[in-house]
Amino acid sequence: PLDRVILPADGVYVVDVEHDGKMYRGMASVGKNVTFEGDELRFEANIFEFSQDIYGDTIRIFWLDKIRDMVKFDNVDELVKQLQADEEIARYWIPENDNH
């Protein structure tokens, strides 16, 4: 169950995910899967460098920045290409006010 969930506007986001006391970078999408004619609101998170089965575990999502709005793609290849670009942005994202 989604307890105490506050979701941002539809789109693709850079996120940090806390699981079991550890933080991981990832990207998440909120919205309807319009490329595949989806009409239900969905939340999906991709945690980078992470391969554990955590279904049923509690996680915390920290919404860091919006990458883009949800887009309907003409085909799966276009979607995959965009997701690869989104991942590149999310992996190397740093806060604007970070002086390091």
Where are the regions a protein language model picked out?
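Phosphate/ribose-recognition catalytic cores of enzymes acting on nucleotide-derived substrates
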Residues: P1-H100
